């Protein structure tokens, strides 16, 4: 396979010369010969300054980098207090359910029932331990501004659920985010390792992380009766949702390809991994493996998988042609050092800028 050729930008600067000249003839009497007075020609040389131009970068050779300024005001150990009031919504939004129902089923139960995950209407308010505070999302409101459902895969079987709170359009954002993911990490003894991992990633230029925040959650359940008080649900870890909004926030290409790996071993899967206009394309089957979070043109993905599964092509050539090798090496080393075994075929994203061939 041919390697990636670097294109050099050559700048040509034209040098021009401008000449100024004049001759004056003066006649002095009959006895003297004509005297020619020639003024000195002044030659003005126009100097051309050569501009220092940065070498044009070939997009396939640009390494993945995060936006450091995004984390400047982060306080790793701070705790934000959130108040969530849940109520029954309506059938059209799939929110006509009780809070008890939300906390009774795992994603596998929903698959067995053949239905979408239940949701409830929610009013999210942010404040301190005394209550919602002015200037924060939801302050002074009394009607729902969000929907709430469980999140996660195997963790959805735990007694303590993780929640996905989706703020409605035109209802504001929290730190520029409309999707608020709250993770309990019930089976993780320390409960803070996930946040610690993201905090450590911030110090590694070759990797891109996500913003995180400890959250103290209070929930008021109005789905079955009114007049109840807020119940203390303890500490959660909020993790930024990686989507087009997050790509833009992190200085990445929001128009690029982005896939969330749900269950995928990087085989070709020709009967499932197809382009949208191919016969037999099934988006539901596709997203059981790879959830589409960015551009829906799958050509680049298919090209990469085809070469990766062609054993006549050396793995070194495949990596060079299709992947940011620096990012992969650092990512793998980090997972090994952290003892993370849950990102082999899931819980990871594939990203590629729009006009790049590199993942």
Residue positions per predicted region:
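Active-site acidic catalytic loop and adjacent metal/ATP-binding pocket
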Residues: 84, 165, 321-359
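A conserved helix-loop-beta module that forms one wall/lid of the active-site cleft
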Residues: 189-222
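Bacterial N-terminal signal peptides that target proteins for export
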Residues: 2-10
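Short beta-strand micro-motifs enriched in acidic
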Residues: 151, 220, 351-355
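Conserved oxyanion/phosphate-binding beta-strand-loop segments in alpha/beta enzyme cores
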Residues: 120-184, 293-300
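Regulatory N- and C-terminal appendages and interdomain linkers associated
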Residues: 11, 16-141
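Internal "kinase-insert"/substrate-recognition segments embedded within catalytic cores
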Residues: 169-171, 207-210, 226-333, 341
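Soluble non-cytosolic domains of exported or imported proteins
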Residues: 114, 159, 187-195, 292-299, ...
């Amino acid at each position: 396979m041919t390697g990636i050729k670097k294109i050099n930008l050559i700048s040509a600067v034209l040098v021009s010369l401008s000449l100024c000249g004049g001759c004056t003839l003066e006649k002095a009497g009959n006895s003297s010969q004509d005297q020619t007075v020639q003024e000195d020609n002044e030659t003005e040389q126009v100097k051309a300054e050569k501009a220092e131009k940065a070498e044009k970068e070939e997009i396939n050779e640009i390494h993945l980098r995060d936006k450091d300024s995004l984390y400047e005001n982060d306080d790793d150990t701070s705790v934000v207090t959130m108040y969530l009031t849940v109520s029954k919504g309506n059938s059209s939004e799939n929110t006509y359910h009780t809070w008890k129902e939300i906390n009774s089923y795992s994603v596998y139960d929903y698959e067995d029932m053949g239905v979408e995950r239940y949701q409830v209407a929610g009013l999210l308010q942010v404040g301190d331990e005394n209550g919602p505070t002015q200037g924060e999302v939801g302050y002074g409101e009394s009607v729902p501004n969000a929907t709430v459902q469980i999140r996660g895969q195997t963790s959805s079987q735990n007694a303590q659920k993780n929640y996905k709170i989706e703020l409605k359009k035109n209802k504001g954002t929290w730190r520029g985010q409309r999707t608020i993911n709250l993770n309990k990490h019930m089976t993780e003894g320390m409960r803070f390792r996930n946040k610690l991992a993201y905090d450590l990633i911030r110090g590694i230029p070759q990797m891109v992380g996500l913003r995180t925040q400890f959250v103290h959650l209070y929930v008021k359940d109005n789905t079955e009766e009114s007049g109840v008080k807020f119940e203390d649900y303890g500490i959660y870890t909020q993790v930024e949702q990686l989507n087009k909004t997050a790509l833009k926030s992190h200085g990445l290409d929001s128009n690029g390809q982005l896939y969330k790996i749900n269950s995928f071993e990087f085989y070709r899967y020709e009967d499932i991994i197809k382009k949208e206009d191919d016969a037999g394309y099934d988006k539901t089957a596709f997203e059981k493996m790879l959830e589409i979070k960015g551009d829906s043109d799958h050509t680049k993905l298919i090209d990469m998988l085809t070469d990766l599964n062609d054993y006549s092509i050396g793995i070194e050539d495949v990596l060079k042609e299709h992947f940011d090798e620096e990012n992969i090496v650092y990512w793998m080393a980090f997972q090994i050092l952290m003892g993370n075994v849950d990102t082999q075929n899931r819980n990871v994203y594939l990203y590629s800028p729009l006009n790049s061939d590199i993942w």
